[in-house]
Amino acid sequence: MVWPSAVINILDAENAAISGAGTLDCRGKIFWDKYWTMRKDYEKRKLRWIVDYDCKRVRGMLISNSRHITLKDFTLMRTGFWGCQVLYSDQCTLNGLKINNNVGGHGPSTDGIDIDSSTNILIENCEVDCNDDNICLKAGRDADGLRVNRPTENIIVRGCIARKGAGLITCGSETSGCIRNVLGYNLQAYGTSSTLRLKSAMNRGGCLLYTSPSPRDTERSR
């Protein structure tokens, strides 16, 4: 699916890092407001689901087709769409990120971290406050996902905090390429709706194998 470029893009790279105590404010409220305005119009025509595709919003960061990438110790906030997406990549580390998409409005589909068709990923010491999945694992969607057939596997999530959101760790709904070997431990959930959320669709295909999250502390979560 064609989607707008992210604010920061790491494409076809190897052995690179972005680190430091700075803040990337993506000022995504303009996209949030556009979505809610379009949604009202689409709902009147019983086309609510289409607005998710027609209202293309900008991600905060994208790592794509890359290896040995590290993101460390900065704040990412007010992204127009997903916060940080790791796509078709291997051996990446996200350490000490603070993602806050609950500043100045209600951002739709503002996932914190999305790992998509990628392998050997470490997510640690991150804090995510958002309006959708806190940390989400995906592996391609429908026919295109089956065509690409790249799994998300060998994922470790540890020492992370999920605040507002729709799932500390969510698998899916993009599952076509399979999600395998996920380990989560020493995790804290304060306000997210679920600690582990599994979702897919009847015609999507794929599999979900060997997932083991172990939250240490939960509050107002299922």
Positions of the model-derived regions?
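Detector for repetitive beta-architecture
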Residues: 15, 21, 68, 91, ...
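Short glycine/acidic-rich loop motifs that flank beta-strands on beta-rich extracellular proteins
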Residues: 27-31, 59, 80-86, 103-111, ...
